[in-house]
Amino acid sequence: HKGAHFIGTNPDLNIPTERGLLPGAGSLITLLEAATRVKPVYIGKPNAIIMDKAVEHLGLKRQEIVMVGDNYLTDIRAGIDNGIPSLLVTTGFTKPEEVANLPIAPTHVLSSLSEWNFDEN
């Protein structure tokens, strides 16, 4: 339909599962974008729309929050791009060997969330 809005949740091309990588929302959105020639408006991570709502809901300052995730492109960039400290856990999508080549470093990097000291951070 001409003039309809095209809203996407997130640009994740793949999602890790127990069976390996499967197509994520971004892969389907990319297909629809190519077919319709309409650019989507993403409302999920890493975009400000969802992050601003989360900060508002928490009622905290951005520096009092830590964005935790295993995917640099969505989870960690959500923190970086929105002024929120980030914690990359390398147990999922982003692997330990990729960390040194990331364009902007996360605030913290751990191999497991169990390494995080909740009393000190």
Positions of predicted regions on the chain:
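Asp-based, Mg2+/Mn2+-dependent phosphohydrolase catalytic module
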Residues: H1-N121
